């Protein structure tokens, strides 16, 4: 998978930038990555920046059932993706996600729930916070990391640029008294801040 990832990214994109903003993964913490979702390229560029070669852990993506069909589904499985029904998530899918978090895997959840093109305000679904609170019953040290992903063009163009900006880790237990609405507003602000940094670095 590393070879496929390297070849595809190097051939398609001319330049990459990663803004870690002093970012470091908290020790002994289970990680949930919360990136903006602008393109089908997001999974590949995020794996490059936060995958096994960088963090010693794979990125495991939670995606919609429709995204796991056909050739795209085959490729997503190779990236470490698994599907969930957004309207009616099964207990087995939720248990699987919680088990990944408990084992210390890096779970990737796109809080917007779908690809959201530029020019549209971020609207976050309720699933991420619900999942994090459920997982917190199994393991107390859960950290959400807001991430902004930007491309020089949308849709990403051949020999274009991309940038990832990592925000300050958010310990979920520090916000256990938040309502879903309040937490989503807070996370929305953090993701937007990181996306704005990433956009600036690709000339947008």
Predicted regions and their residues:
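Alpha-helical membrane-targeting segments
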Residues: 1-15, 69-79, 157
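Helix-to-loop junction immediately C-terminal to a conserved catalytic motif
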Residues: 5-37
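Catalytic core of membrane glycerolipid acyltransferases/transacylases, capturing the structured
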Residues: 26-88
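Residue-level preference for the first positions of well-ordered beta-strands
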Residues: 30-32, 104-110, 143-145
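Helix-adjacent hinge/juxtasegments
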Residues: 82-103
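Catalytic-site beta-strand/loop segments enriched in glycine and acidic/polar residues
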Residues: 100-129
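A cross-family acyltransferase "interaction/gating" segment
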Residues: 119-181, 186
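A cross-taxonomic marker for long C-terminal extensions/tails that follow the last structured domain
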Residues: 177, 181-204
């Amino acid at each position: 998978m590393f070879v496929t990832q390297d070849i595809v990214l190097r051939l398609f994109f001319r330049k990459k930038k990663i803004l870690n903003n002093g970012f470091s993964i908290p020790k002994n913490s289970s990680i949930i990555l919360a990136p903006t979702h602008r393109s089908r390229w997001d999974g590949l560029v995020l794996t490059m920046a936060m995958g096994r070669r960088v963090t010693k852990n794979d990125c495991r993506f939670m995606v919609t059932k429709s995204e796991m069909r056909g050739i795209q589904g085959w490729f997503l499985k190779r990236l470490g993706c698994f599907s969930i029904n957004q309207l009616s998530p099964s207990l087995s899918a939720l248990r699987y996600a919680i088990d990944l978090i408990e084992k210390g895997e890096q779970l990737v959840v796109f809080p917007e729930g779908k690809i959201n093109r530029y020019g549209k305000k971020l609207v976050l679904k309720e699933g991420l916070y619900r999942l994090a609170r459920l997982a917190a019953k199994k393991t107390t040290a859960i950290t959400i990391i807001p991430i902004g992903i930007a491309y020089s063009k949308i849709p990403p163009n051949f020999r274009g640029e991309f940038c990832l900006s990592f925000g300050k880790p958010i310990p979920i237990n520090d916000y256990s008294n938040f309502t879903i609405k309040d937490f989503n507003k807070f996370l929305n602000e953090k993701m937007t801040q990181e996306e704005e940094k990433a956009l600036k670095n690709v000339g947008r």
